[in-house]
Curated annotation (Swiss-Prot):
The keyword Acetylation belongs to this UniProt entry's keyword annotation: no
GO biological process: chromatin organization
WD repeats: 7-48, 221-260, 343-386
Principal location listed in the UniProt entry: nucleus
Record-given protein name: ASTRA-associated protein 1
Gene that encodes the chain: ASA1
SUPFAM superfamilies recorded: WD40 repeat-like
Subunit: Component of the ASTRA chromatin remodeling machinery complex.
Similarity section: Belongs to the WD repeat ASA1 family.
Phylogenetic placement of the source organism: Eukaryota, Fungi, Dikarya, Ascomycota, Saccharomycotina
Localisation: Nucleus
Keyword Repeat tagged: yes
InterPro entries in UniProt: WD40/YVTN_repeat-like_dom_sf (IPR015943), WD40_repeat_dom_sf (IPR036322)
Functional description taken from the UniProt entry: Component of the ASTRA complex involved in chromatin remodeling.
Amino acid sequence: MRFTLRAHVSTVTDLKPVSHRQTPHLLSADSKGCLYLWNLISRRPIASIDLKTHIIAIEVVGQGLYAALARDNKLRFISLQEESRLTRINDKVSRELQSLEIVYEIPVNCLNFANFALQDLGLRNYRLWCCNTMDAESIDVYEFQLGDRQSFKRTFNAINLFDSVAGLAEAKQKFRFDKMGIVMRFIVAGDTVFCGYESGVVVGLRIRDKSLQICYASFAHYPEPVLSLAHDRTERRVFSSSTTDQVCVHNIPTPDLPVVTSVSGIQVVANAGTREEVINAPLKKIGHLAVLNDILLLTSWHGYVLGLQDQKELFRYRKERNLLCVDDSTDGQAETKKEKPWINPGPIAGIAHSTDSQLVLEKLPIGGHRRLKNFLEHKWYITGYNDGTITVSQI
């Protein structure tokens, strides 16, 4: 079973399942700045906001609170409001939707298309990891209290990991670059933040007693860039992908490892260069990864969406084009535009059933009751596409 969500009119850049609500919901963003909150049972958006700038990445922060990083160099915190307004979905359709409103925003460098990482420190305090203001090869770390604009402070400025990473024994055997390259991806995995670089290096970072530590470093993707990172919370590991067919598995280091050296003020713990496991996927150029229980989800630049279970192919899907595009040539004759026969997939996510959702079964109409029951009984993967559509597919 597969159904399609339609509201975006430009490339879907990111999507995140929302688990804080009683029924399954989804948050999605696009390259024109539209952000939608979807009810996956009614299959319609229930709230929206137009930021009017390319949204790079989004995160679900908490109950009714979301974060969006955009190309205008701002990270916005957005809250779901109770009041509704008439919102135009496209040229023909308008719907009554709840409001999403900006409640807090801070400046963040977007020189490249890296995402961001947020660590919840409790009591509405957060730690933000992102690219440095002036140098996309370096990292800044900020701490702030949500809603207090005076609390925003940079705790680490322009962190460049090259000297610390290049000093590892594993790096000396393999690493031949004179720099790490730009930061491509961030992801939070418990108390560790993993960073993927243009050079193919994946580094795990922690903050201990106000000191920055390198607790993990992998060179498996070198010299190809890291394209995606995904956190497997069940098995305490992180997956990474690149332009090759290799997906690397990085085990999250145990806490409180002994520090063996310090380079340029950055601590390096024992065995930071531990070897990683490598999975050979049946295709290359894996742009996005996600984990759903024991299933690894991925999308490829070749148009395929793939599911792997125990390193075996569980499913494969490609959304084919069904219409020909026609361009006018310079001599006035219509010419068929040559395009790829498929629509490029982008971000992917997985959703498994939640027993909490059964609390609202009695409040739904018969049709909604049936759809929710079916949704809870299966696993689903959700894919955003370059044409603005989002497919929700049953596994």
